[in-house]
Design a protein with these regions (language model features):
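Conserved phosphotransfer microenvironments
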Residues: 50-65
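Hydrophobic/aromatic residues positioned on beta-strands within the core alpha/beta folds
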Residues: 74-76
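C-terminal output helix
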Residues: 94-107
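Acidic, metal-coordinating helix/loop segments flanking the phosphotransfer/catalytic sites
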Residues: 5, 29-46, 54
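Two-component/phosphorelay signaling modules centered on CheY-like receiver
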Residues: 11-29
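Conserved acidic carboxylate
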Residues: 8
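Conserved phosphotransfer cores of two-component systems
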Residues: 41-43, 64-70, 81
Length: 111
């Protein structure tokens, strides 16, 4: 079972994504900010994250810190810098099925 890290500062959204991904068969870790994410990303196949997360480290800095070492899927409701080293950008609101398919695709790439 692949381990996924979900990074989201909105507690309701975080819990909803955790439940959806667990129901889809993933082992899910969560983080409310970049600092927690930096402590928890190792061992994960994919990081699913909101780009706008609170300081001390914002989403772009988190991406720079982990890019190339784990697959990164960004969920964004706005404009995303085109040069961010992420694997995929999904627009919010993102249907659960699309998120699950995206995660499965990136896990398959790693195998």
């Amino acid at each position: 079972m692949a381990r996924i890290l979900v990074v989201e500062d909105d507690a309701t959204q975080l819990e909803m994504r955790r439940q959806i991904l667990q129901h889809a068969g993933f082992d899910v870790a969560t983080a409310r900010d970049a600092q927690e994410a930096l402590e928890r990303w190792k061992g994960c196949a994919v990081v699913v994250m909101d780009l706008r997360i609170p300081e001390p480290e914002d989403g772009a800095r988190l991406i720079q810190a982990i890019a190339g070492r784990v697959r990164i899927i960004v969920l964004s409701g706005g404009q995303v810098e085109p040069d961010l080293p992420v694997d995929e950008i999904l627009t919010k609101p993102c249907p659960s099925r699309r998120l699950i398919e995206s995660i499965q695709r990136w896990i398959h790439v790693e195998e």
